Amino acid sequence: MGMTSDSIADLLTRIRNALMAEHLYVDVEHSKMREAIVKILKHKGFVAHYLVKEENRKRAMRVFLQYSDDRKPVIHQLKRVSKPSRRVYVSAAKIPYVFGNMGISVLSTSQGVMEGSLARSKNIGGELLCLVW
């Protein structure tokens, strides 16, 4: 698995494709940033769980996907906002409310990667990585 120039977009695409194919899990290359994003998705119930595994001195992450009782993905959309070619930064006041608060935004802040509502409550902005609903 080669790292693309945008590993976050790659992570979101892999999750999106795995959900469309109704897979139970998806394997992705591990990075601290990717794990931080997946950890938030797990905390908010968008993924079931994940584990980090070591293979041939390379770290991989297995993300177990979450489906509703009628086997529909609980994630409707994963949208990359900030991109390497066009970074998007927001102040705390400009952190979006996603899909009538059913969704989340994920930010990279001076205090680490966190969910938008947490950044808003701490009154800190940052790079708007992605939206999930």
From Swiss-Prot:
Pfam families: Ribosomal_S8. Transmembrane segments: none annotated. Keywords: Ribonucleoprotein, Ribosomal protein, RNA-binding, rRNA-binding. GO terms for molecular function: rRNA binding; structural constituent of ribosome. One of its GO terms (cellular component) is ribonucleoprotein complex. GO terms for biological process: translation. The keyword Ribonucleoprotein applies. InterPro entries: Ribosomal_uS8, Ribosomal_uS8_CS, Ribosomal_uS8_sf. PROSITE patterns: RIBOSOMAL_S8. Signal peptide: none annotated. HAMAP family: Ribosomal_uS8_B. NCBIfam families: PRK00136.1. Part of the 30S ribosomal subunit. Contacts proteins S5 and S12. One of the primary rRNA binding proteins, it binds directly to 16S rRNA central domain where it helps coordinate assembly of the platform of the 30S subunit. Belongs to the universal ribosomal protein uS8 family. This is Small ribosomal subunit protein uS8. It comes from Chlamydia pneumoniae (Chlamydophila pneumoniae).
